[in-house]
Amino acid sequence: MDFTSLIPSASKEELVKEYVGKSLHDVPCPAVVLDISKLRKNCTDMLETVNSLKCGWRAHIKTHKTTELTRLQIGDGPGPANIVVSTVVEAENIVPLLLEYKSEGRAVNILYSFPLTSGVVDRLSKVSTALGPNGISLMIDHPSQLRSVAAIHEKTNIPPLVFIKIDMGGHRAGVIPGTETCSQLISSVITLTKRNVCILHGLYSHAGHSYSSNSQTAALDYLRQEFEALLITYEEVHSVAATKLPLVLSVGATPTSSAIRNLLLSSTSSEELNEISALKATMGAIHDVGCEIEIHAGVYPMLDMQQLATHALPEDLLSWSSVAITILAEIASLYPPRGTSDSPEALITAGSLALGREPCKAYPGWGILSPWNRTSFALPNTGPEGYSGWQISRISQEHGILTNPGKNDSELSIGQKVRIWPNHACIAGAGYGWYLIVDESRTGKEDEIIDVWARWRGW
């Protein structure tokens, strides 16, 4: 059965033939570049953290949409391969990898994390059939969506696992705990579970508003709020079920999922110690009622300016050197006295389609010029909020305007290649059909392309 998108990805073989062995200085712009040494480190750090804390792990693959990076997120070994997707095309394209893991004896599961609609029933039913029992999880936040859950069961004769999405303050999706709708939803799911139409597997939250964090303490507080919202909801589930019903309580956005690593670090801040103590107490209460804690996150392998601005970890663990994604562009023109107070400006070959039009709360621009291929410029220890060098201040469809408000950065030249740290990696990568892979740990060969990863396209 073919699960590939009707929008075909570029041929891996042709991409490798075209790019591998070339230097970043010799490829067309704009292009998106990933440093595999940073990807590996970020993925390893997350896996080691959740394993040390004895938490479950679910890797979100919506940011990159590739098989290669999914492998790094899941890791080796016999443990379960649980993933989250935001689109059906991600689920369809990752089925072969999960079947490979399944053949090795690993448990596999895909969580389709958008509240279920009737339009995806047929395609998700095929995914469920391919993976078999316990292979697919569905997200719901309204009782009416259970008709689609039942339709998938009818088509496959496999009861899908179900997560109830909880709105714990982000107001993007999810049912609000303690509301009548939440009570109706819990009761309806339990009824279908008793009829073996589905299996209530867990409660899920996404603290998207945790991107407003500006310290470890703030990110930890959002994480605690996630746990508390799910624990409160579980208490109602337990009451309605009238029996012990162990569930998976799945929390995370990259700021909160990163922040949980602070539990393994030494802290000198009394405020942070108090927050860690409160968080540990909440996690302990979850274990006491027999529930499993699961962590999920997506953009953490790449990171970006939005993530640096959260300061969810100490600076030695979350810094400029952690960011694995850059956008490769070329200087097209120079306008020396055009900026504010006669500051210089430059035109680059990357606009909103190449960078995304995503803001970062720490500074007013749309991307920051990395030090690559430039004379030395000292990056601040503070993150984007302290940066005063070349940055993308204005963008249109294909034009990006670099400004140097501090007039303290190196000069640029027409034809010079530059690499930009984007504000939001998920959006910046979406305009490209593939990633150029380099390994900056290869001394003397940092700019050599060693692989190309094709992205899945469409929905």
What are these regions (language model features)?
Residues E14-L34:
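Generic N-terminal amphipathic, Lys/Arg-enriched alpha-helix
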Residues L161, M168-E315, S319:
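Active-site loop/helix belt of alpha/beta enzymes
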Residues A259, S321-L328:
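Short coil-to-beta-strand transition motifs
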Residues M46-V50:
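N-terminal signal-anchor module of multipass membrane proteins
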Residues L39, K62, I94, I164, ...:
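Conserved, mostly hydrophobic/aromatic
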Residues P336-W459:
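C-terminal accessory subdomain/extension
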Residues M1-E18:
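Eukaryotic N-terminal targeting leaders
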Residues R58-Q216:
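Active-site-proximal beta-alpha core segment in soluble small-molecule metabolic enzymes
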